[in-house]
Amino acid sequence: MGVGRRSNIRAPAYMSSGPSYAQPVPAAYGSGMSQGTAASPFAGCVERPIRFVHRGRIAEVAGADTTRTLLDWLREDARCPGTKEGCAEGDCGACTVLVGERDAQAPGGVRFRNVNACIQLLPMLDGKALLTVEDLKPAAQACGAALHPAQQALVECHGSQCGFCTPGFVMSMVQVYERDRAAGTAPGRQQLADDLAGNLC
């Protein structure tokens, strides 16, 4: 199985502890969620339900095949087609989502990083949090905005062509925006190029 560049060499991303466009994952963790690791990928089916935070609540998936990808679950089971399948090898970035893990040192107590959903096995989400492109608008509206600033910038600057790769670019841009907003910094052109290197148009 191929290995995605971003999911292995990208520096950890941090979501802001202030008013954020991410769902309130720390609160959901407090309702019985653990930091447990997923079952072995060689076990056939996961013996206990997989639990992870999605859209501010704990999602539970029972009887999941250990070889099922997060992308397949999103598109086929959760009916969330916003996350696209491009290369299915972890190279094009069309399927980019953000996966969060508890981290007391991170703003808000959760550390998010970019992940290629096409090579992320579903059981690996156990005890974590998930943020997809379709989760951005409701969270933005809760903060009094129509879209996340990354989405709004793409609209205003005509940043899409056919649009198929756009959701992946958006999620990478969200990670950059939230990371730098929390740090009070602004990325330079070269930093942005590095951050978006895993997304192909």
Q: Where is each model-derived feature located?
A:
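Low-complexity, intrinsically disordered Ser/Thr/Pro- and acidic-rich segments
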Residues: 1-3
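Signature of N-terminal electron-transfer/Fe-S-associated modules in redox systems
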Residues: 5-201
